[in-house]
Amino acid sequence: MFNHIRLGIIGCGWLGTALGSKLVRQGAFVKGTRTQAEKAKELMAFGIEGYPFQLKEGSWIGDLTFFEHINVLLIAIPPGLSTDQTSNFVAKITPLISQLKKYKLEKIICTSSIYVYGQAQGKLNEDSQCHPNKLSGLQLIEVEQALINNFPDTIIILRLGGLIGPDRHPIHRLRMRSRIEAGLNPVNLIHQIDVLAGLEKVLLTQKKQHCYNLVSPYHPIKEDYYSQLAYQWEIPPLKFDQQTKYPKKISSNRFVSDYDFSFIVEKLLIE
């Protein structure tokens, strides 16, 4: 099914490695980058050609042969502001855009985040106004627009909900807090299984529009969701503030319609 795909993944981490290894098993040729040479070599265990490659502000360090013999590129790197508040994601992506103009790629896919919506409230879709209240959201919007402006015929941006899956779930961070704020807010999450299924749809389907949300349609309030999960996983009871803060339910109806997509993980691990 994927024999015609020659995919390059910039940022072959938790999500990129899962996608790459799955596609390799289905006949695709996959290259992936990691920032360290030793970590890049580890990708061979998944059938992925590993390349050391690191984006810097205004430049990069790495092996540019990564870009040869691929027809699709996935950019799956976070802004990095959680570990470095001075990081300029826009300045890192700008030289990458210049490099990509040298190649004829059928599709460029970029994972973004629902952080771009920030203080926006209510039921939101891709046409809703973004009101980012964090630097990461502001920089993601700039990067999205730069990619759309430079690659209008090939770019597809996926704004992902909060990621959950193998060895990854917000509850492990939230359980360390004495009290969790905005307990009455709806959750906007997505399981790795559904992200991979969505990316497969994008790879196999003709491009429709520039930007899509990819968030589970299951939106219980935080208190109900995390309390039930804590019970299932035998985590001590969590405490929540009985209030909302920029509550929102983010819709993926556009993606579901354009790509004939059905979510696989219906209740985000709730049994």
Regions found by a protein language model. Give the residues of each.
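C-terminal amphipathic/interface module of NAD(P)-dependent oxidoreductases
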Residues: E49, F53-E57, I235-E271
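Conserved beta-loop-beta element that borders a ligand/cofactor-binding pocket
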Residues: E142-P166
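Conserved N-terminal Rossmann-fold NAD(P)-binding element of oxidoreductases
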Residues: L7-G11
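NAD(P)H-binding glycine-rich loop region in Rossmannoid oxidoreductase-like domains
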Residues: M44, I48-P95, Q99
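Substrate-positioning beta->alpha
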Residues: L160-L163, H169-H172, I180-L203
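Conserved Rossmann-fold NAD(P)-dependent oxidoreductase catalytic core, especially the SDR/UDP-sugar
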Residues: T94-N133
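N-terminal Rossmann-fold NAD(P) dinucleotide-binding loop
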Residues: G16-T17
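Mid/C-terminal beta-alpha module of Rossmann-like enzyme folds, strongest
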Residues: L196-S252
